[in-house]
Amino acid sequence: MTNKIPSSWPNPQALTIVMDRAARAIPPAWPLASSVAVNPFLGQTEEPLAKVGARLARVAGARVTMPRRWYAQKIAAGVISEADLEAAIASAPVGSRSVDVSTLKSAANAEALPPKALPTIAELAAYASGIDWPGIIAERFGAWAAGYFDEGQALWAAPKGKRAYAAWRAVAAHDLTPEIAGLRDFALNVSEAPETALAIVERVVARLGLPADAAETYFHQMLMTLGGWAHYARYKLWQAELAGGADETITDFLAIRLIWEEALFLQYDAEIAAAWRGVRTAHAAPVEPTRDIAIDAILQAAAEHAAQRALAQTLAEHSPHALNDRPALQTAFCIDVRSEVFRRALESMDPRIQTIGFAGFFGLTTSHRRFASDVEERRLPVLLNPALRSYSGGLEAHAKDQSTRVKTRARRAWGRFKLAAVSSFAFVEATGPVYVGKLLADALGLQVSPPPSDPSPRLDPAPDLATRVETAETVLRAMSLTRDFARLVLFVGHGANVVNNPHASALHCGACGGYSGEVNARLLASLLNDAEVRGGLSRNGIEIPDDTHFVAALHDTTTDDVTLYLDDHPSAAHRGDLEQARLWLTSAGKIARTERALRLPRAASDASLPKRGRDWSETRPEWALAGCQAFIAAPRRRTAGKSLGGRAFLHDYDWKQDKSFSVLELILTAPVVVASWISLQYYGSTVAPDVFGGGNKLLHNVTGGIGVVEGNGGLLRVGLPWQSVHDGERYAHDPLRLSVCIEAPREAMSEILGRHADVRALFDNGWLHLFALDEAGRMAWRYAGDLQWSAIGNLDAPAASQRLKVSV
């Protein structure tokens, strides 16, 4: 058996490069405490959907489109028209245009064979021996990884401080489970393995005879077989690089997985050698979509064209006249699709109410410490680093801070006592009856958790006046709020108040890093109520009237209740304004709940919705962002009074106030990217739930405090649970790539895309669709890739009439 790397490798550095590429093909997964949506195709956005479909079929047996019956049903119902099919064919790569409408219709009614991944050595060995080696690997790796990554859940945590590869070797060298299952001398082989991950990868590549052109997809497959553990390791690398460092965990994982492959290959060489040679050859072949995958990609494009046609019709509807008088109330909400329903309901209360859409972190990238806590919460988009630090409370709350810390420690100690191996059984026998009342109250949903009510947050250290003025000006200009201020302006963050839900943070604000948005809203309200800051803004051309008062609020997206943080900045002069605002918000909440109840299973009326978040057994307290289809950056008058069904991210933007297009650049590179992550996570969890979905909530167990497994162990599940995209009978989410509609000059958008290759790749390769709105707010131009635009005219027209390309 040779230990020499095959001659197809050009140089020693090539192996490191391929290992790194495989690692970056895995998307990161954030821990449960601050989980955010992640694009599961993050490592493949340089390729179009069909090619990624071929790649993921090879390494994971994953689909990237829906089953064909889904498209067939939409064609039969008239949702997808012949014009949509023609447009999809016309927009397909040249090599995929050898189909016509008739072919597509026939294909939609004939389900293609599901993709099947190339077999791993573990699978070949399982076939040869009858032993479930992939299952054993998943179970043993998961048991070790749960302890290695533990964030405080385990009572007996694994030792910290070692790199993943070294820590695993220390455990695996004494783990006899593989040998009991039939893998001879595995523990001994692990103890004698090279000391570094790179050295073991070099040895395995040599022993398996793995050529260079086969390694990338094979290494990618190895990491995919580790499920969410590889995703969490990728998160460690993401966080390290964001801070300017590095992390080797994910390449250590690759080495660990390859040790298993090597051991199984050595034991079953005679039985599987011929099959392995065929697998190697298949891995070395270029990644190209099959005809079935190409057809599926065209059907997917047709479904998206149909949705865009419906959106264009909605945007073309008559808009109400713009408000000329001073608004009675201005409310700035997060761009989250759930806010669209509430904003529309609130605006229906009075024509003098103006709502604004802006990213829910309100432009303040802060690392925050909650009251009586030393935990740093990064309340900002995960793409960014915090520029500010903040905390809740101050010297006046010191005594309460200390008493709260003592109570928290006591609760933690009591909780660990209840779960400890020695005391847990005696605890249940001795104190079980005492908990009957609490158990009944919780089980019946009688306990109502209050909204976050920490003392007013403050920046620490406090920036100087010039910085505070600059920050305030940047935020106001970014939300196009520079004039015509109301007497009362609300900054409304959002969160979700739910119980018995490990994925609760996924219901919070993605722009706030998986936390609720009240901290950022309260900080901004404090900043703009500062008289010195207002004076600086006035000198810079933003005149805020003396009678304008800013108040922070929190929208509970499960109940549609809104909490106002009035104690931060009490104002007797605005008592009447606040009472009226409360009435409007309460009425709007009822309207929003009524609309949302139509989509939720077993929601008989709006009154039943608040109970869902308190119900232990409720797997769907709300739909969160299911159904998201569009991102619209334009003045609110373009969408006001038009029902977008809670399916659109709405960002206020007036390009005529954006002289340098710096706000446009910010929108394209931050909110649009975050929205794409959300949209594509829902997409991936729907089309490939076994690979990119979070599994079944009914089977979830939290492990390590960082994620969930199904059952008693094994692979970490990432992505959205099935109950988040399906109501038990039908899909709650139509997996459509996001349509981004922006009212701005095409030249400006092209120039920005030209400066940001990663963002441009999302549009050039079809992971996002980009449209330019005209001066009437209608979808007039489609981005055609390569910094070119197509005039789209009537979206109902056949595609041939839409092929005019204009370079700008």
UniProtKB/Swiss-Prot annotation:
GO MF, any single term: zinc ion binding
Membrane topology field: Peripheral membrane protein
Main subcellular localisation: membrane
Keyword terms of this UniProt record: Cell inner membrane, Cell membrane, Membrane, Metal-binding, Transport, Zinc
Residues annotated to bind Zn(2+): 334, 336, 494, 509
Cofactor: Zn(2+)
Pfam families, sorted: DabA
A cellular-component GO term for this protein: plasma membrane
Location(s) in or outside the cell: Cell inner membrane
Subunit structure: Forms a complex with DabB.
PANTHER family, per the entry: INORGANIC CARBON TRANSPORTER SUBUNIT DABA-RELATED, UPF0753 PROTEIN AQ_863
Similarity comment: family membership: Belongs to the inorganic carbon transporter (TC 9.A.2) DabA family.
Record function comment: Part of an energy-coupled inorganic carbon pump.
Name listed for the protein in its UniProt record: Probable inorganic carbon transporter subunit DabA
Organism name: Acidiphilium cryptum (strain JF-5)
Lineage of the organism: Bacteria, Pseudomonadati, Pseudomonadota, Alphaproteobacteria, Acetobacterales
